[in-house]
Amino acid sequence: MLICVTNRKLCKDDLLTRIAQIAKGKPHGIMLREKDLTVIEYEALAFVVNKICKENGVPLIINQNVKAAIKLKIPDIHLSMDNLRSFKNELELAGFSQVGASVHSIEEAKEAERLGATYLVAGHIFSTDCKKGVPPRGLQFLKEVCESVTIPVLAIGGITRNHIDEVAGTGASGVCIMSEAMTCANPAALVNQFRF
């Protein structure tokens, strides 16, 4: 399972072109991160990205912006633990089909599952420029998260092709990649390169 996470600041070319190339490779989802955009800017971008994703049969995952997901009728959302706790009632009312949560401890993983998350993203597993100066949590942490819940767990943070076997050995269901997705030479080939 592969989820590609956007970050236009890492993207060396046009973000929409790159998203279209990634979507052609059919990952399990494309998560629209872009946390620094205003709500209006995010909604406008999500509208266009959703069209690209639909054309390619790839789910768009809205990151954090519950109101945009509801407004655009996008059924997949990814939340921080704080937002998962805050929006629990709204999530139930909105009827999202997939609710992901970012977790950084075993306790958070268990809580997220109790609150209704359908999958978890655990990290950061390896060193990454996105979290400079913060030590990675490592494979043992990932294994413990996987063992503590019954829902799928994806690894994030410093994931490269060279890590796939190690990550798969922890019981994880897949990976989320951002830097590689935004900078690689052949975005359409990512799914095959990160296959478990």
Explain the meaning of each model-derived region:
Residues 2-6, 30-32, 60-62, 77-79, ...:
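Hydrophobic faces of well-ordered beta-strands that scaffold small-molecule active sites
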